[in-house]
Every structure is written in C-alpha cells, then in structure tokens.
Design a protein with these regions (language model features):
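N-terminal beta-strand motif that seeds the catalytic metal site of vicinal oxygen chelate
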Residues: 1-22, 63-65, 115
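Short beta-strand micro-motifs in enzyme catalytic cores
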Residues: 8, 39-41, 63, 97-99
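Tryptophan-centric aromatic hotspots in well-structured domains and transmembrane helices
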Residues: 9, 14, 24, 31-33, ...
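Residue-level hotspots at or immediately adjacent to binding/recognition sites across diverse folds
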Residues: 9, 51, 78
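Conserved active-site alpha-helix within GNAT-family acetyltransferase domains
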Residues: 19-28, 99, 108
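Short secondary-structure junctions
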Residues: 29-35, 85-90
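Conserved short beta-strand elements that form part of the metal-binding/catalytic scaffold
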Residues: 31-62, 108-113
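Vicinal oxygen chelate
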Residues: 66-108
Length: 115
C-alpha cells in the first residue's frame, strides 16, 4: 500500500542502450520489466520498485529516490515550506504526475502520484 512521504521507487540512469541494461538485469538477477515508451523500463522484482530512464537528454546522472503523495500539490507546498527547492515543476508522464526537489544538502528527490 502506498503512503504519503514513503519511498515509492528508485529511478536509475539507463544510459544510451536500454535494451542492454534490461538484458543485464534479466540475466544477472532475473528481473522482469514493463516498458513505458522507448526510453523507460520499470521493474518490480528487484526488492524495491524502480525503473531505468534511458533518455540521455533527461539529465538523470544518479539514482533518483521517488516518494509518494496522494495530493501532489499539497506535498509540493510542504516541501517548499520546509525549505526544499523545486527543481522540476509538476509534470505528467505515463501513469502519473511528479515533481523534483532538492533538499538542504543538495540531494535531488522526486514526489509522485498515480493518475
């Protein structure tokens, strides 16, 4: 069950060859994937849900921890009030919406809601 403020999934850089990344994790660890377009593949059997973002233009250079919120706008307001800086405004993607923020230490995280 998804809960506000809990880690929901981890997004990892997928590099320029997403099929090769998927093949590696399938072969080495037995993971299976669900593709969301040509540049994103989600996994659910790696111990925690997650996905690989293959679009080199997306700017993802490190793992991205994604938190969950029922009310995305309310959570965005809480993040701002607590001193977080919104680095990517709310946007839609297949399966939901999310925003990114940086914490006081400069770590980038995201908050997601289902649609």
């Amino acid at each position: 069950m998804r809960e506000d403020g809990k880690i929901d999934y981890v997004e990892l850089p997928g590099g320029r060859d997403l099929p090769a990344v998927k093949h590696f994790y399938q072969s080495a660890f037995g993971w299976s994937f669900v593709d969301y377009g040509p540049t994103y593949a989600a996994f659910q059997d790696g111990g925690v849900d997650g996905g690989f973002q293959a679009d080199p233009e997306a700017g993802l250079k490190a793992p991205l921890v994604v938190l969950f919120a029922q009310d995305l706008e309310a959570m965005e307001a809480k993040v701002k009030a607590a001193g977080g800086v919104i680095s990517v405004p709310i946007f839609a993607f297949p399966g939901g919406r999310r925003f990114h923020f940086t914490d006081p230490a400069g770590n980038e995280l995201a908050v997601f809601t289902e649609e």
